[in-house]
Amino acid sequence: MLILIIGSAPDALEAQNLKRELFGSIVAINNAWKVRKDWTNCIYPEDFPENKRPKSSKTQTLHSSEEYVKAQNHFGGFVYAGGTMAFTAGYWVLYKFKPQIICYTGCDMV
């Protein structure tokens, strides 16, 4: 299974050109849910404003620190990865989906 993680850097728009059927899930970090309408998961930190979060549905779920802290601690905690949401999302994806490949776009921290 391949998982796509989309961040908020300018090249995140490249995700619009990727075929949905390639990915088991599409995980958006923070505002990246606006890049594609077919995202499946949106992960965000505690300080991400509630009015900027998308609405959840049966096929699109929201995930906060209540979930990803447990996942990150499973892999050694924030000491090893820091608070960068690109790394946090990666560890959460690894913990939740156990994918063969994690693909990133828009996470180059420009």
Q: Each predicted region: which residue ranges?
A:
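Extreme N-terminal starter segment of soluble prokaryotic enzymes
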Residues: 1-3
